[in-house]
Amino acid sequence: MKTAWVFPGQGSQAVGMGVDLLSTAIAKEKYQQAEEILGWSVVEKCQGDEASLALTQNTQPCLYVIEAILADLLRDKGFQPDYVAGHSLGEYSALYAAGVFDFATGLQLVKQRSEVMASASGGMMAALMKFDQTQLQQALTDNTEVVLANDNSPEQVVISGTVAGVEAILANVKARRAVPLKVSGAFHSSFMAQPSQSFAQTLTACHFNDATVPVLSNVDPSPTQNGDRLKEKLIQQMTGSVRWRETMVNLGEIGATDYWEVGPGKVLTGLCKRTCPDLNLKNIGQLDDLNSL
């Protein structure tokens, strides 16, 4: 049996997440450390207003902290992953779980990343469900203002680009459902190149250890442990596509049998059910999930 720990990204947050973890010493210590770095309380933010929690500059640090705590609690119970991966923001949690950087370094990176993404303006993102694949591929070929931002599953993708470009694709591609996303910019596209420049410099200057277990990155989901290579992939992430469908397929091909979503919600296990039905799925999002292991 080989287990992959996968960490969700923005969109998995929910009011009340992570509060039950406070009964553990590991969580208390991490929440205190996070407050010193962020200047605000993750626990209070997670117990507050839904609209405030949904702001990129709040969501991303909160998710990273909670996912890091859950990974620590799993290890404290004697569990170890054979592989790790994370969806967009979740890649930072995966790198922490693989020992590429420590908790504080990861949170400082996530804080800056969230501020860069929150301040991005212009552009649009939209999710398409049960869409005509041939139509979409042709539309993306014809429309240079839009890219495939998240290839989540055979039935779900996210596109990103100019407002006019995204709206044109939504109007011309048949889909069971198409939902514009409530985000400030065209994330995971070349439109993030300018705002992400300073953050890329921060990442370049940051030391990355070699990973203790193979990491499957968003922009290139081949198993990698070399710290410098993992850094290169992370630098490309904000402007590159999240190749999540390939990540799930690759996990199965390299021998993963169990797929644990470490973080709030069930977004990633939901995607995996449709793409790789043979994998054993488990959600580790709260204390009850840990206690049931």
UniProtKB/Swiss-Prot annotation:
Active site residues according to the UniProt entry: 88, 188
EC number of the protein: 2.3.1.39
Pfam families xrefs: Acyl_transf_1
Pathway: Lipid metabolism; fatty acid biosynthesis
Catalytically driven reaction(s): holo-[ACP] + malonyl-CoA = malonyl-[ACP] + CoA
Keyword Lipid metabolism in annotation: yes
Keyword Metal-binding among UniProt keywords: no
GO cellular component annotations of the record: cytosol
Matching InterPro entries: Ac_transferase_dom_sf, Acyl_transferase_dom, Acyl_Trfase/lysoPLipase, Mal-CoA-ACP_Trans/PKS_FabD, Malonyl_CoA-ACP_transAc, Malonyl_CoA-ACP_transAc_FabD, Malonyl_transacylase_ACP-bd
Entry's Gene Ontology BP terms: fatty acid biosynthetic process
Protein name: Malonyl CoA-acyl carrier protein transacylase
Catalytic EC class: transferase
Residue ranges of coiled coil: none
MF annotations from Gene Ontology: [acyl-carrier-protein] S-malonyltransferase activity
Similarity comment: Belongs to the FabD family.
Gene: fabD
Keywords from the UniProt entry: Acyltransferase, Fatty acid biosynthesis, Fatty acid metabolism, Lipid biosynthesis, Lipid metabolism, Transferase
NCBIfam families in the cross-refs: fabD
